[in-house]
Amino acid sequence: MKIINILFCLFLLLLNSCNSNDNDTLKNNAQQTKSRGKRDLTQKEATPEKPKSKEELLREKLSEDQKTHLDWLKEALGNDGEFDKFLGYDESKIKSALNHIKSELDKCTGDNSEQQKSTFKQTVQGFFSGGNIDNFANNAVSNCNNGGS
């Protein structure tokens, strides 16, 4: 019976010593929880920023005239995915195409300028439905002239 009492006392002492360490463990867990919360906040703050579209990235690199003609081209190509395909081309080729559009539209003056611009828009639509941007300046030409008709 004495042995059982001694073992029981040793067991209680051992159990008591484990509880004293648990207080430190609880403090550490609380600190870890706080630091984990801070880490989660920094991750949440970083995620709301959504990536920019190809069009937005391109617009940052264009002049005001080029942006205007990009809008014109977007309207001309419509929602058939041709505009998205256009945005996939090299930036220098896109700028060259936009400058070509500007020069062709600037030629459209006079009484029939709106009709000439509409015809050029149809020409551009037809070109991008099957053409490659490399030949754009040669194949997408307006019937406009400087004098108008």
Swiss-Prot record:
Residues with a covalently attached lipid (S-diacylglycerol cysteine): C18
Signal peptide, first to last residue: 1-17
Induction statement: Strongly induced when grown at 35 degrees Celsius.
Lipidation (N-palmitoyl cysteine): C18
Keyword match Zinc-finger: no
One GO CC annotation: cell outer membrane
Entry annotated with the keyword Oxidoreductase: no
Gene behind this protein: mlpD
Location, primary (coarse class): membrane
UniProt biased composition (Basic and acidic residues): 38-58
Record keywords, A-Z: Cell outer membrane, Lipoprotein, Membrane, Palmitate, Plasmid, Signal
Pfam family, one: Mlp
Membership in a protein family: Belongs to the Multicopy lipoprotein (Mlp) family.
Stored InterPro entries: Mlp
Annotated membrane topology: Lipid-anchor
Protein name as catalogued: Lipoprotein MlpF
Compartment annotation: Cell outer membrane
Record function comment: An outer membrane protein that may participate in pathogenesis. Some human Lyme disease patients have antibodies against this protein. The Mlp proteins probably undergo intragenic recombination, generating new alleles.
Region (Disordered): 26-58
